[in-house]
Protein backbone atom coordinates (compact mmCIF):
# COMPACT_ATOMS: atom_id res chain seq x y z
CA UNK A 1 0.00 0.00 0.00
CA UNK A 2 1.21 3.49 -0.86
CA UNK A 3 2.10 5.56 2.20
CA UNK A 4 1.93 9.33 1.85
CA UNK A 5 5.21 11.03 2.67
CA UNK A 6 7.00 14.26 1.94
CA UNK A 7 9.71 12.36 0.07
CA UNK A 8 7.07 10.85 -2.21
CA UNK A 9 5.67 14.34 -2.83
CA UNK A 10 8.86 15.28 -4.64
CA UNK A 11 8.36 12.58 -7.28
CA UNK A 12 4.60 13.17 -7.36
CA UNK A 13 5.06 16.88 -8.10
CA UNK A 14 7.38 15.94 -10.99
CA UNK A 15 4.86 13.43 -12.33
CA UNK A 16 2.00 15.91 -12.02
CA UNK A 17 4.03 18.49 -13.96
CA UNK A 18 4.65 15.87 -16.65
CA UNK A 19 0.98 15.05 -17.13
CA UNK A 20 -0.48 18.44 -16.23
CA UNK A 21 1.61 20.44 -18.68
CA UNK A 22 2.15 17.90 -21.42
CA UNK A 23 1.52 20.50 -24.12
CA UNK A 24 -0.81 18.31 -26.13
CA UNK A 25 -3.14 21.28 -26.80
CA UNK A 26 -0.32 23.46 -28.20
CA UNK A 27 -2.06 23.83 -31.55
CA UNK A 28 -5.11 25.57 -30.09
CA UNK A 29 -4.78 28.37 -32.67
CA UNK A 30 -5.13 25.84 -35.47
CA UNK A 31 -7.92 24.10 -33.54
CA UNK A 32 -9.91 27.35 -33.35
CA UNK A 33 -9.22 28.10 -37.01
CA UNK A 34 -10.42 24.62 -37.99
CA UNK A 35 -13.59 25.30 -35.99
CA UNK A 36 -14.48 28.49 -37.84
CA UNK A 37 -12.82 31.23 -35.82
CA UNK A 38 -11.34 34.12 -37.81
CA UNK A 39 -7.86 35.45 -37.09
CA UNK A 40 -9.45 38.46 -35.37
CA UNK A 41 -11.55 36.24 -33.12
CA UNK A 42 -8.52 34.08 -32.31
CA UNK A 43 -6.59 37.23 -31.37
CA UNK A 44 -9.41 38.34 -29.08
CA UNK A 45 -9.55 34.88 -27.48
CA UNK A 46 -5.80 34.87 -26.85
CA UNK A 47 -6.00 38.39 -25.41
CA UNK A 48 -8.84 37.27 -23.16
CA UNK A 49 -6.69 34.37 -21.91
CA UNK A 50 -3.76 36.66 -21.06
CA UNK A 51 -5.94 39.40 -19.55
CA UNK A 52 -7.74 36.85 -17.36
CA UNK A 53 -4.42 35.37 -16.28
CA UNK A 54 -3.04 38.81 -15.42
CA UNK A 55 -6.12 39.90 -13.46
CA UNK A 56 -6.44 36.56 -11.65
CA UNK A 57 -2.82 36.11 -10.56
CA UNK A 58 -3.17 37.98 -7.25
CA UNK A 59 -6.63 36.60 -6.34
CA UNK A 60 -5.44 33.04 -7.04
CA UNK A 61 -2.42 33.72 -4.82
CA UNK A 62 -4.76 34.84 -2.04
CA UNK A 63 -6.69 31.58 -2.45
CA UNK A 64 -3.42 29.67 -2.32
CA UNK A 65 -2.67 31.34 1.02
CA UNK A 66 -6.20 30.68 2.29
CA UNK A 67 -6.58 27.04 1.25
CA UNK A 68 -4.25 24.07 1.04
CA UNK A 69 -1.78 23.41 -1.76
CA UNK A 70 -3.68 20.30 -2.75
CA UNK A 71 -6.96 22.23 -2.96
CA UNK A 72 -5.41 24.74 -5.34
CA UNK A 73 -3.87 21.97 -7.44
CA UNK A 74 -7.27 20.23 -7.58
CA UNK A 75 -8.93 23.49 -8.65
CA UNK A 76 -6.33 23.95 -11.38
CA UNK A 77 -6.99 20.51 -12.81
CA UNK A 78 -10.77 20.97 -12.54
CA UNK A 79 -10.48 24.24 -14.47
CA UNK A 80 -8.33 22.48 -17.06
CA UNK A 81 -10.91 19.73 -17.54
CA UNK A 82 -13.77 22.23 -17.80
CA UNK A 83 -11.77 24.34 -20.25
CA UNK A 84 -11.17 21.29 -22.45
CA UNK A 85 -14.88 20.43 -22.35
CA UNK A 86 -15.83 23.95 -23.43
CA UNK A 87 -13.32 23.79 -26.27
CA UNK A 88 -14.63 20.38 -27.37
CA UNK A 89 -18.29 21.36 -27.26
CA UNK A 90 -17.86 24.93 -28.52
CA UNK A 91 -18.71 23.90 -32.09
CA UNK A 92 -17.62 27.24 -33.53
CA UNK A 93 -19.39 29.44 -30.94
CA UNK A 94 -17.12 32.32 -29.98
CA UNK A 95 -18.53 32.87 -26.48
CA UNK A 96 -18.20 29.22 -25.53
CA UNK A 97 -14.57 29.30 -26.61
CA UNK A 98 -14.14 32.58 -24.69
CA UNK A 99 -15.35 30.95 -21.49
CA UNK A 100 -13.06 27.99 -22.18
CA UNK A 101 -10.11 30.37 -22.49
CA UNK A 102 -11.00 32.06 -19.17
CA UNK A 103 -11.13 28.65 -17.49
CA UNK A 104 -7.80 27.71 -19.04
CA UNK A 105 -6.21 30.90 -17.68
CA UNK A 106 -7.58 30.06 -14.23
CA UNK A 107 -6.15 26.55 -14.53
CA UNK A 108 -2.69 28.06 -15.00
CA UNK A 109 -3.26 30.59 -12.21
CA UNK A 110 -4.26 27.95 -9.66
CA UNK A 111 -1.11 25.98 -10.40
CA UNK A 112 1.14 29.02 -10.72
CA UNK A 113 3.61 28.73 -7.91
CA UNK A 114 1.53 26.18 -5.99
CA UNK A 115 3.43 23.14 -7.20
CA UNK A 116 6.75 24.90 -6.50
CA UNK A 117 5.57 25.81 -3.00
CA UNK A 118 4.43 22.21 -2.45
CA UNK A 119 7.83 21.00 -3.64
CA UNK A 120 9.69 23.40 -1.32
CA UNK A 121 7.59 22.60 1.75
CA UNK A 122 7.84 18.86 1.05
CA UNK A 123 11.63 19.03 0.67
CA UNK A 124 11.83 21.04 3.90
CA UNK A 125 9.58 18.60 5.81
CA UNK A 126 11.62 15.66 4.48
CA UNK A 127 14.86 17.27 5.68
CA UNK A 128 16.01 17.84 2.09
CA UNK A 129 15.71 21.62 1.98
CA UNK A 130 19.33 21.93 0.83
CA UNK A 131 18.42 19.92 -2.30
CA UNK A 132 15.39 22.04 -3.20
CA UNK A 133 17.13 23.85 -6.08
CA UNK A 134 18.15 20.51 -7.57
CA UNK A 135 14.57 19.20 -7.27
CA UNK A 136 13.11 22.44 -8.60
CA UNK A 137 15.47 22.45 -11.59
CA UNK A 138 14.58 18.86 -12.39
CA UNK A 139 10.83 19.53 -12.17
CA UNK A 140 11.23 22.63 -14.36
CA UNK A 141 13.19 20.60 -16.91
CA UNK A 142 10.46 17.95 -16.90
CA UNK A 143 7.81 20.62 -17.48
CA UNK A 144 9.72 22.19 -20.38
CA UNK A 145 10.51 18.84 -21.99
CA UNK A 146 6.92 17.65 -21.75
CA UNK A 147 5.57 20.86 -23.29
CA UNK A 148 7.82 20.18 -26.27
CA UNK A 149 7.01 16.48 -26.38
CA UNK A 150 3.30 17.30 -26.19
CA UNK A 151 3.60 19.67 -29.14
CA UNK A 152 5.35 16.97 -31.18
CA UNK A 153 2.65 14.43 -30.32
CA UNK A 154 -0.07 16.99 -31.11
CA UNK A 155 1.48 17.37 -34.57
CA UNK A 156 0.14 13.93 -35.42
CA UNK A 157 -3.41 15.21 -34.85
CA UNK A 158 -3.32 18.42 -36.94
CA UNK A 159 -5.22 17.00 -39.90
CA UNK A 160 -8.73 17.18 -38.50
CA UNK A 161 -8.10 15.32 -35.25
CA UNK A 162 -7.20 18.18 -32.89
CA UNK A 163 -10.32 17.45 -30.83
CA UNK A 164 -8.48 14.35 -29.62
CA UNK A 165 -5.78 16.52 -28.04
CA UNK A 166 -8.39 17.93 -25.65
CA UNK A 167 -9.64 14.43 -24.83
CA UNK A 168 -6.04 13.41 -24.07
CA UNK A 169 -5.59 16.52 -21.90
CA UNK A 170 -8.71 15.60 -19.91
CA UNK A 171 -7.33 12.09 -19.40
CA UNK A 172 -3.96 13.49 -18.27
CA UNK A 173 -5.71 15.91 -15.89
CA UNK A 174 -7.53 12.96 -14.32
CA UNK A 175 -4.16 11.25 -13.82
CA UNK A 176 -2.88 14.43 -12.13
CA UNK A 177 -5.90 14.44 -9.81
CA UNK A 178 -4.96 10.91 -8.74
CA UNK A 179 -1.36 12.03 -8.18
CA UNK A 180 -2.53 15.01 -6.08
CA UNK A 181 -4.62 12.64 -3.97
CA UNK A 182 -1.43 10.68 -3.22
CA UNK A 183 0.43 13.80 -2.00
CA UNK A 184 0.88 14.57 1.68
CA UNK A 185 -0.15 18.11 2.54
CA UNK A 186 2.66 19.99 4.33
CA UNK A 187 1.97 20.50 8.03
CA UNK A 188 2.15 24.29 7.80
CA UNK A 189 2.35 26.99 5.18
Question: What role is predicted for each listed range?
Answer:
Residues 74, 78-92:
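C-terminal ends and interior cores of transmembrane alpha-helices
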Residues 18, 83, 94-111:
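Hydrophobic core of transmembrane alpha-helices in multi-pass small-molecule transporters
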Residues 102-143:
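Cytoplasmic helix-loop-helix junction between adjacent transmembrane helices
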Residues 50-58, 144-148, 152:
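Residue-level signature of mid-helix packing/kink "hotspots" within the transmembrane helices
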